[in-house]
Amino acid sequence: MYGVLSSPLELTGDFEKDIDIAYEYFSTAINDRKKRPTLFDKEVFIEAHEIIEGRPEGFWHVISLEENHHFKVLPCVNDGNIELCNQNCNASHHAIVVKYGAETRNVCLLRASRLPWIIDIIKLAGKNDSSVNVWLKPGTGRQNGKLYLRYNHHGADFVLIFSVEKRFYRLISSFPVFYTNEKENFDKDYRKYAWSYFDT
């Protein structure tokens, strides 16, 4: 049986209000260590060292995308959020600077609306639910291994990527998967690196 994801956050199209809505969810469900689920008996770490506009960098990272990423097809093309953001992913009218000034990212209301899926997918993976493909790519040199959780059912294709640390998994990215080549690459990686905590 496949698990089902929560409904996306209901947004308004007013960027400031929508960022507040997303941040309220992030603060209570994701950033609160007492409420945040564990993953395979390890804590999930959310980056919070850098505070930008009163909010941790980890929040901005999961609701935005790199400014230099230009889309041929918008990720929200079949989603109601396309009417709300005025193509901010390409227009850059709502940008945030992270990594102490080293990177500019564009706020993405599609990603913001999908914040509940981060918690859902972590919980489903923790139950060994067949809706989530899990794979572990080994690190190279000084680079840590990467743990991938991909939900691809009921019309939703969404991936979480974690850096594997000694005592925790550090969330480094989460996003909808919509490019054909990206889907194929993830399918290929899953076939090569499939991993199960429950078989170890």
What are these regions (language model features)?
Residues 1-200:
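Ribonuclease/tRNase effector modules and their secretory precursors
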